[in-house]
Amino acid sequence: MSGGCGSMYKIEIVSPEFKGKSMINQHRKVNQILKSVIPSLHGLTLVTKSDE
């Protein structure tokens, strides 16, 4: 997913770890894991859900 800049990403994650967690808490978990690479990205779209 890029508007020509090459650094816009869409990440879709399905995990049982997300069960019972709000979307904001799911995204916080992913952001914590990706914190070292996020500054180099122009844009990031997260889609997270549990495997229910």
From Swiss-Prot:
Domain of life: Eukaryota
Signal sequence coordinates: none
Pfam families: BolA
Database matches in InterPro entries: BolA (IPR002634), BolA-like_sf (IPR036065), Mt_Fe-S_assembly_factor (IPR052275)
Residue runs in coiled coils: none
Family: Belongs to the BolA/IbaG family.
PANTHER family named among the record's database cross-references: BOLA-LIKE PROTEIN 3
Protein known as: BolA-like protein DDB_G0274439
Lineage: Eukaryota, Amoebozoa, Evosea, Eumycetozoa, Dictyostelia
